[in-house]
UniProtKB/Swiss-Prot annotation:
The gene is hisZ. Pathway: Amino-acid biosynthesis; L-histidine biosynthesis; L-histidine from 5-phospho-alpha-D-ribose 1-diphosphate: step 1/9. This is ATP phosphoribosyltransferase regulatory subunit. Belongs to the class-II aminoacyl-tRNA synthetase family. HisZ subfamily. Heteromultimer composed of HisG and HisZ subunits. InterPro entries: aa-tRNA-synth_II/BPL/LPL, HisRS-like_core, HisRS/HisZ, HisZ. The keyword Ribonucleoprotein does not apply.
């Protein structure tokens, strides 16, 4: 096997794509800062029990594992940064007030999430800790939409769901409790025939409710239908009330409801959301409330947040235009060096041509050139 080959679904990021990704990262992190979010940088590697604390079985399967040569304990390469940031809030910062944190970094997956998906997403996200009210959920959703708008995605759909609906149904039926994991999988796939089969022995009320969930999607009127078609259990009523409130708080966003879109069900504790762009079947951003993750670190805190994959976002954007630059000759003369330093301080890209490579441009388009005239270095347009 050639030694330059990489593992399946792992790829180098070349200059044009890398520039798009980095520009996106800077714009989004700067926007997080404007909302008051503090940047944290968790390690790529942690003890496995800490890394998987509060996470579901799916996260365990997605995590690369290895043995620490120093301690002999099992380590994990992070597959998601949410738990790490919750650990920082609960154990290291240990604040009593509301805390807003953001992050960006690579994560690794044992298997890709889709046919052409990378196993090394570049995750970026934000979290609010310490406030259980819907105001925090609404802010996180606003921040996610604003981040995508800055990236160039303005025609998006905010899809709302709530884990409380399914959990209330399951808690009300002993047979359903045994099949919780399977029900979650079938509902996400909207596999109605399989749902009909697995719910055959359930109570009639539970069965009708579970079979109704895949069809309960659409605009805000879905909530009215849900109140009619689902049992009036306290957990369901509370979840539908919260979704109605979040819909009203979403302003002019294009909001839809999908009571079977249960991504993150295993560790989410309340309202969830996914954001879709036209022409793509998979969400470009996901988020929601997960109040119990901090319990694993000895300090339960209300929490809500979202994350996105910068690589995926960059891939959806148009090819970046080549960056304008100034070509300068190679030389160490004081006047030339002074001029180049001044231009770079002013934000100009100045590329000094090495001898024999005067016409190489690569990622940059040199539309101007630095020339010596009458003892002064001046800029002239090319072409």
């Amino acid at each position: 096997m050639p030694n330059w080959l990489l593992p399946e679904n792992i790829a180098d990021v070349l200059p044009s794509e890398a520039r798009k990704i980095e520009e996106l990262r800077r714009v989004i992190l700067d926007n997080f800062h404007l909302y008051g979010y503090e940047l944290v940088m968790p390690p790529m590697l942690e003890y496995l029990d800490s890394l998987l604390a509060g996470a579901g079985h799916d996260m365990d399967l997605r995590t690369f594992k290895l043995v620490d040569q120093l301690s002999g304990r099992t380590l994990g390469l992070r597959a998601d940064m949410t738990t790490q940031v919750a650990r920082i809030d609960a154990h290291l910062l240990n604040r009593a007030s509301v805390t807003r944190l953001c992050y960006s970094g690579s994560v690794l997956h044992t298997r890709p999430n889709g046919l052409h998906a990378t196993r090394e997403p570049l995750q970026i996200g934000a979290e609010i800790y310490g406030h259980a009210g819907l105001e925090a959920d609404a802010e996180i959703q606003e921040l996610a939409l604003a981040s995508l708008a800055l990236a160039g995605f303005t025609q998006v759909r905010l899809d709302l769901c709530h884990v409380g609906v399914l959990r209330a149904i399951i808690e009300n039926d002993a047979n359903a409790q045994k099949d919780e994991s399977a029900l979650y999988t079938l509902l996400r796939a909207k596999d109605v025939p399989a749902l009909q089969e697995i719910t055959a022995a359930y109570g009639e009320e539970s069965r009708r409710a579970l079979l109704a969930l895949p069809s309960l999607y659409g605009d805000a009127t879905v909530l009215t239908r849900a109140r009619k078609e689902l049992p009036a259990l306290p957990g369901i009523t509370r979840a539908l009330d919260e979704l109605a409130a979040l819909t009203s708080l979403a302003g002019e966003a294009n909001v839809t409801i999908d009571l079977a879109d249960l991504g993150g069900y295993q560790y989410e504790s309340g309202a969830m959301f996914a954001i879709y762009v036209p022409g793509l079947p998979n969400a470009v951003a996901r988020g929601g409330r997960y109040d119990h993750v901090g319990e694993a670190f000895g300090r339960a805190r209300p929490a809500t947040g979202f994350s996105m994959d910068l690589r995926e976002l960059a891939r959806l954007l148009p090819v970046a235009e080549r960056k304008r630059a100034i070509r300068a000759p190679w030389g160490r003369e004081a006047l030339l060096r002074s001029k180049i330093v001044a231009l770079r301080k002013a934000g100009e890209v100045v590329i000094q041509s090495l001898p024999g490579y005067e016409n190489d441009q690569d990622e940059f388009e040199c539309d101007r050139v630095l020339v010596l005239e009458d003892g002064n270095w001046i800029i002239k347009n090319l072409g």
